[in-house]
């Protein structure tokens, strides 16, 4: 069977993964990874990663900067929409009542959804505005470190 290879797209995906990991986010690649991470006590920030421009230009940079704050989540994790489809679908099962959105952020406390920033809260905004939105959620739900 003939199979296309898209090295440029693969490079973009790998760069997007690397940026999230370098910012301190743990990759969740399987549904089991998601369940294990979301069972951890405390607060968890979930970055629903994507290859779109607003993910690379706004969401990932905002995620990297937002966590340098007096109050921040206990755990930082990421799933990759369109890539790790089963893991992303499992994560979205925890976001009860929220439509699928990527990129996006979900803040969980003890495995329960507290708040969500959707693509429309990210796209068209400056990264600093998204940082401020995330840090406002940290102020409300997270402990000082």
UniProtKB/Swiss-Prot annotation:
It holds the Pfam family Disulph_isomer. GO terms for biological process: cell redox homeostasis. It comes from the Bacteria. InterPro entries: BrxB/BrxA (IPR009474). Belongs to the bacilliredoxin family. This is Bacilliredoxin GK2368. It comes from Geobacillus kaustophilus (strain HTA426). The lineage of its organism: Bacteria, Bacillati, Bacillota, Bacilli, Bacillales.
